[in-house]
């Protein structure tokens, strides 16, 4: 899967009004089984999720994503999350995790609503940072 820096930066600007990813980080993502999903409405991007497989594990890190403010609360984030989980399962992965901060309460609520469990919390630059994880092999002994 191709993860083009210009495309990711365009999506970031649309959602966050600024660019957070670096060329170095995107190169890392590109080299670790990236999963990039983009949601469109009327042929225009309105949301995205970008993740990658953590080397040496069967875990997908859902690293970056969001939905444009004009399109929130319409099910787009839920659809992206479900599709990312399905792709991770298809890839044979057994876990998916994400991090979030207090300022992204909707992301935290979406994760909790979908069975993600809080596995760690600590202060990062004066703000609480949370790690959430979901076992994709529910009901399977492993």
Language model features: what each stretch is:
Residues 53-63, 72, 124-128:
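A conserved beta-turn-beta hairpin within the catalytic core of GNAT-like acetyltransferases
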Residues 15-41, 50:
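Active-site rim helix/loop that mediates acceptor-substrate recognition in acyltransferases
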Residues 88-100:
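Conserved GNAT acetyl-CoA-binding A-motif
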Residues 114, 121-142:
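C-terminal "cap" of GNAT-fold acetyltransferases
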Residues 1-22, 142:
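Short amphipathic alpha-helix that is part of the acyltransferase structural core
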Residues 67, 73-86, 113:
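Conserved acetyl-CoA-binding loop-helix of GNAT-fold acetyltransferases
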Residues 78, 90, 102-120, 128:
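Conserved active-site alpha-helix within GNAT-family acetyltransferase domains
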Residues 38, 44-53, 59-66:
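Conserved beta-strand in the GNAT
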